[in-house]
Amino acid sequence: MSLSEPIFRMEGISKRYGGAIALKDADIAIRRGAIHAVLGENGAGKSTLIKIMAGVVTPDEGRMLLDGREIAFASPAAANAVGIVCVFQELSLIPDLSVADNITISHPPQRFGMIDRRAQRRIAEEALTRAGASDIHPSILVKDLPLSRRQMVEIAKALARKPRLIILDEATSALTRSDVEKVFAVLKRLRAEGMALIYISHRMHEIAQLADDCTVFRNGRSIESYPAGTKTDQQVVELMIGREYNNVFPPKPAHRPEEKPILSCRELSWGDRLSGITFDIRPGEVVGLGGLDGQGQRDLLLAFFGVLRDLKGEIAIDGTQVKLRSPRHAKSGGISMALIPEDRKTEGLMLPMTVRENLSIAALDRISRNGVIDRAAERREIDDLFKLLAIKAATIDMPVAGLSGGNQQKVVIAKWLMNRPRIILLNDPTRGIDVGTKQEIYLLLRKLADGGAAIIFYSTDYDELIGCCDRVLVMYDGSIVRELEGADINEHELIGAALNIGGEHAQQRIAP
């Protein structure tokens, strides 16, 4: 088989869940030695497609061919056995096991009936090196790694299975920029070795850098396949959403709000993670936190939300100094703060519970009367939020796990809006969701700010900081090194400040 011929085909694939059509007559052909990008909004059918490829679910109609021969998978193990391995967006790692245990979990090396730890470590080290993550020690527990490093372990685990076709579902959404570059280098090397790769991402610039072939899905159908680089980003997005695509970011206000600050901090420090943080935010502002990942941005959000202990410095709400004792205190009526977490699966949602239960739990005090939930008030609140965020769900009593990723993220945001917060903290809120949902979230943030909310927005995506924020505070090594505003919020300035490149702006503090 030549490199230009498909190694794997799916023809006329359909899948239904009850009355809902997840896939309808979908086709795709994957070549050896090529990276094939699969694009589409959340709910377009991409997840069902790769679950069928990976043996997680079986199609109702259609056929799959590997090397020209028709095949069917009864389980993920059957797909793995022929060399098809998937790295899902929801990590499959077991937190309480070591990195080496996770990498070799399907086929641990044995000696005398016991796991051969020396061989296991060698396999893990080789896989981590191949994944560009040789700095991760095989014996460390997965739960002790940050999310970005866990994703690298997941990729190493897939490579340890020696795949012929590897499927990556939003594999870079949790990664730092340096890790993304390492993954790109790995994928390009695997392509050069003749491996077939399927790459799912909502980041258009990643598709432009990596892909050889592209297929767009919409409403469960494969809309068009084309060689990468033959369509503009706007044309691709219009294929994805089925309508004309306008500017993704809403307009910013012409003038900075003049009200008194709603939130202020002075010389806020925490161990060696935060140092001398000083700034104000006013009602109606969207203030971004920039900088390389891991420079204290998440710690700062947790400090404001009452999670961190032994803080030094001052925090004031409406000019009155406060000591935020807990998240419950931070979200209480006098302060009225909300935190949209980074990982919706583990921090933002209770997946087995219903949409209704997930939404109501953050506002029980407000929608209860004498300890009993007022169902009429609850329903009114939920209906209003469904309209505001355009949440798509068959019913509010369905498990939230059954929603698409974009709608799950909308539920996370809606949950915190149930409390009508005045201060909203967002930790990379659009990670792993489609461009259409991102645009809806950007519009919502500006609408909330226009309504008087103060928003602190951490994002690893420079385009979001540029498009959404009135000001950006760039952090480096736990400190704010530069404030950018207006035309200065551009990629050149953001990168320079993130690297703390010298000149008069280096180590610049924000004046009270």
Swiss-Prot record:
The reaction(s) this protein catalyses: D-ribose(out) + ATP + H2O = D-ribose(in) + ADP + phosphate + H(+)
Molecular function terms from GO: ABC-type D-ribose transporter activity; ATP binding; ATP hydrolysis activity
Domain ABC transporter: from-to ranges: 8-244, 257-502
Entry keyword set: ATP-binding, Cell inner membrane, Cell membrane, Membrane, Nucleotide-binding, Repeat, Sugar transport, Translocase, Transport
Membrane topology per record: Peripheral membrane protein
Positions annotated to bind ATP: 40-47
Enzyme Commission numbers on file: 7.5.2.7
Pfam families: ABC_tran
Entry keyword annotation includes Cell inner membrane: yes
Protein purpose: Part of the ABC transporter complex RbsABC involved in ribose import. Responsible for energy coupling to the transport system.
Family: Belongs to the ABC transporter superfamily. Ribose importer (TC 3.A.1.2.1) family.
Complex formation: The complex is composed of an ATP-binding protein (RbsA), two transmembrane proteins (RbsC) and a solute-binding protein (RbsB).
Name the UniProt record assigns to this protein: Ribose import ATP-binding protein RbsA 1
Organism in which the protein naturally occurs: Rhizobium etli (strain ATCC 51251 / DSM 11541 / JCM 21823 / NBRC 15573 / CFN 42)
